Regions:
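Bacterial N-terminal signal peptides that target proteins for export
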Residues: 1-10
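N-terminal (or domain-start) structured segment
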Residues: 25-26, 30-142, 181, 189, ...
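An extracytoplasmic/periplasmic, membrane-proximal ligand-sensing/linker region
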Residues: 59-61, 243, 298-367
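C-terminal motif of bacterial Sec signal peptides marking the signal peptidase cleavage site
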Residues: 19-23
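A ligand-binding cleft/hinge motif common to bilobed small-molecule-binding domains
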Residues: 125-136, 198-203, 230-265
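C-terminal lobe and pocket-closing loops
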Residues: 239-309, 358-367
């Protein structure tokens, strides 16, 4: 019996100890989860803008074609700006004189080449009247891209040094009293010199016999040699001969004196009838054939701007009494359209035009 009680006591003690240990123990803590550290995502390098491919132009010499002979105003101005442009582009630029058909021959030659920027046209105001004068069906903004218009010039009336005329009034009075007797050398029909003479016929009653030459240079040579009685040409082409006593400039086709040439009388101060139509002078600029790639014409435009910013160009214009202009893009197009309208309708109104400007869609603008 004692044996069973002893066994019972042992079991009870074991059970009690078990319960005690269970009550005193705490549940084991679960291992803490380690924080998840996200690996930084490497940023992809930003794409750099693709470099524009280098323009492969010019890779050979460029030809700048002038539609009049050497020594005329277009040639003189081209020879002032083109050498500077040549430095800026780093390639040779040859000036080629191709006179004929009031520069339309040269322009046509340019249009018949590949429009790749290697054959350019250095043109002038005569481009605006080719259609009206029935010279050739070409238009300055339809067939060409005006890269840069650079200058305007002033026409002047000049006579040989031994001429009996010492003023514009004396010459006009003689031309009124003796119709057709006086010969006036010009660069050809439709040019500014020709139109200036027509204005004198239309509004002053004078009457001349116009003698066309293949450019202003030959016309000036003719007047200095006495082959014609007078010429109307750009001042920059005659100022040295005037100062040297080889011809006499009687008047400028302006309403104000030419700075530096105070002895030259503005014809608008003598004849009020001409005042509304002057100053009437030509423009000059560099043109590319339509179809020339835009990147090439843009390049040429930038290089022309650099050339015109060169102090040598400023000095050149000042010495030759040129008015600088700086037109390209739409501004040049608007200028050319306005000039074309003015010139074409003036020729038509004076009876010198072969065709009406209306045939070519040239609108008449207000004066």
């Amino acid at each position: 019996m004692k044996k069973f009680r002893f066994l019972y006591l042992v079991l009870t003690l074991v059970l009690a100890m078990s319960l005690f240990l269970t009550g005193c123990s705490t549940p084991a803590e679960e291992p803490a989860e380690e924080p998840v550290v996200e690996e930084p995502v490497a940023e992809e390098p930003a794409e750099e803008p693709a470099e524009e491919p280098e323009l492969a132009y010019p890779e050979r010499p460029i030809n700048a074609v002038v539609g009049f002979g050497a020594g005329g105003p277009t040639d003189v101005i081209a020879r002032g700006i083109v050498p500077i442009l040549q430095e800026k582009v780093g390639e040779g630029i040859a000036i080629t004189n191709t006179p004929g058909a009031a520069s339309a021959t040269a322009a046509s030659n340019v249009l018949n080449t590949t429009p790749d920027g290697y054959t350019l046209f250095f043109g002038s105001e005569i481009m605006s009247v080719w259609q009206t004068m029935d010279t050739m069906d070409m238009h300055p903004t339809r067939d060409f891209i005006p890269v840069k218009l650079v200058a305007e010039a002033t026409p002047v009336l000049a006579v040989p040094p031994n001429s009996p005329f010492n003023s514009a009034e004396e010459l006009m009075e003689y031309a009124i009293a003796n119709p057709g007797e006086l010969t006036i050398g010009t660069a050809g029909p439709g040019t500014v010199p020709h139109i200036s003479g027509l204005l004198c016929e239309q509004y002053l009653g004078a009457e001349f016999t116009f003698v066309p030459f293949l450019g202003g240079g030959p016309a000036i040579t003719a007047v200095m040699g006495g082959q014609v009685d007078a010429t109307i040409e750009m001042v920059q082409s005659m100022v040295e001969a005037h100062k040297g006593g080889n011809l006499k400039i009687l008047a400028s086709f302006t309403n104000e004196p030419i700075p530096g040439l105070d002895e030259v009388v503005p014809i608008g101060t003598v004849y009020d009838e001409l005042s509304p139509y002057i100053p009437y002078g030509p423009y000059f600029g560099l043109f590319a054939a339509k179809g020339t790639p835009e990147e090439i014409t843009d390049y040429l435009q930038r290089k022309m701007e650099e050339s015109m910013a060169d102090p040598r160009w400023d000095e050149y214009c000042e010495n030759l009494y040129l008015t600088q202009i700086d037109y390209s893009g739409q501004e040049a197009i608007d200028y050319l359209e306005e000039w074309t309208s003015k010139a074409a309708w003036l020729l038509y109104d004076t009876g010198a035009a072969a065709k009406s400007p209306e045939e070519f869609g040239i609108e008449r603008l207000d004066k």
